[in-house]
Amino acid sequence: MNMLKKAGIACASVAAILAASAGTASAVSVDEYDDVKYVWCTDSGADVQIENTNAYGGTEDGTFRLSGRIGDGTRSCGWQTFNAGDDVSYVSTWITDEDGGYVYCAIYLDGVLVSQSEDRSSYYSVTGCY
């Protein structure tokens, strides 16, 4: 096989692998009685929208100003913990700042970090952990 044909096959193989994995969303699956902890951080003083799966598998959302200042005080964090009920299979959380700036989320299961994400967009910031 000539070199150009080999390179074409290699590129096609890589493209097929990437296409197969594109769009595959990972989900944080939980078992009954797992301890779940959500953590959110943002620029201090920012009002943010938070949406997450609750202990019963439903969705909760609201607008919050996180008050737990960290580091030099330019960032604030908050958290929520719960014990997963028998109706919960997957958990996720999202944080949005419609004015832009830093947003961060993380999910811990039984004290182990299983998902984290951040966004620093200047106009509209949103990130999700799932």
Where in the sequence are the language-model features?
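N-terminal prepro-regions of secreted/extracellular proteins
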Residues: M1-V39
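Post-signal peptide N-terminal regions of Sec-secreted extracellular proteins
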Residues: V28-Y130
